[in-house]
Regions:
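C-terminal helical subdomain
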Residues: 173, 189-258
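Catalytic Tyr-X3-Lys loop
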Residues: 89-108, 151
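N-terminal Rossmann NAD(P)H-binding glycine-rich loop of SDR-like oxidoreductase domains
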Residues: 12, 17-20
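Rossmann-fold scaffold of SDR-type NAD(P)-dependent oxidoreductases
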Residues: 9, 70-81, 103, 128
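Rossmann-fold cofactor-recognition segment
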Residues: 39-52
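Catalytic loop of short-chain dehydrogenase/reductase
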Residues: 125-150, 155-164, 175-179
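Conserved mid-core segment of classical short-chain dehydrogenase/reductases
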Residues: 55, 71, 80-97, 116, ...
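Short alpha-helix in the Rossmann-fold core of NAD(P)-dependent oxidoreductases
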Residues: 100-107, 139, 147, 207
């Protein structure tokens, strides 16, 4: 039995593949979770756009961890489905729905699979790959941005929920950003020039790091320090036009009303 067990969704290309190649654990058993088999790594076939396949991963993870006697088990949610770029009214409705399944719901559902299966006796950790899109308001990437915001909030909330539960993993969302992956290349090649931020996105893409560099920086940042559930590898945008809230938020301060935090 391997001392380290690592699941990586989307380990077939980009950051996911480089995370597999650069794992710092020499004896690690790498398991790719993807729509297709990888020639070099064990694979579990799961289609993020099809929720009926997600329980295949649940059964696999439960079986592996129920008898796990190694030192650590890690799960990296990295996969991304890029079939619905574009302005909302121009994207095919079925593609848009698939993107919501794949990029918003699936990361949380697959994360839940791992968390629920983890037990005491070994270190466990869940890494949710986020993006600068979590803090950047980029037209044409609505499901992508929504998914990254969801990942970051979910990681922080479930981290707090599991703090008093023995045998549960540490959690961290890693906001990489600035990485020239295959989906980014595709986005740049197919971007509608009439989109408000098209020129900015194209210019930004040419200044990005390679997936190999990004993967190396991610591994350097893990595991996170105690109490940390979000790691960012780059600052957010300075341009107010690319920021959430800012001038788009009106704070009415209605007397007697307050948000309930606890």
């Amino acid at each position: 039995m391997a001392d380290t067990l690592i699941w990586i969704t989307g380990a077939t290309e980009g950051i996911g593949l480089e995370l597999a190649r650069q794992t710092p654990f020499a004896d690690a058993r790498i398991i790719n979770v993807s729509r297709r088999q990888h020639p070099d790594y064990e694979s579990v076939v799961v289609d993020l756009t099809d929720p009926s396949t997600w329980d295949d991963l649940r059964r696999h993870v439960e079986a592996e961890l129920s008898g796990f006697r190694g030192r650590r088990a890690l799960f990296v949610q990295n996969a991304y489905w890029s079939g619905a770029h574009g302005m909302l009214d121009q994207v095919d409705p079925t593609a848009y729905r698939n993107s919501l399944f794949a990029n918003v719901a699936a990361p949380l559902a697959l994360g839940e699979v791992f968390v629920r299966a983890c037990g005491p006796g070994y270190e466990s950790g869940l890494v949710m790959m986020s993006s600068g899109a979590a803090v950047s308001c980029l037209e044409g990437l609505s499901t992508y941005g929504a998914g990254k915001i969801a990942i970051e909030h979910w990681a922080q909330m479930v981290d707090k929920e599991c703090a008093s539960m023995p045998g549960k993993p540490w959690f961290v969302a890693v906001r990489a950003g600035g990485v020239l992956t295959a989906p980014v290349r595709h986005l740049v090649e197919t971007l509608d020039p009439k989109m408000p931020n098209a020129a900015h996105i194209r210019a930004n893409a040419m200044r990005r790091f390679s997936p190999a560099r990004a993967a190396a920086e991610v591994w350097k940042a893990l595991p996170p320090p105690p109490g940390v559930s979000l790691i960012t590898l780059a600052p957010g945008p300075d341009d107010p036009a690319l920021q959430f809230e800012g001038d788009r938020m009106l704070d009415r301060h209605v007397p007697g009303w307050q948000l309930v935090y606890r």
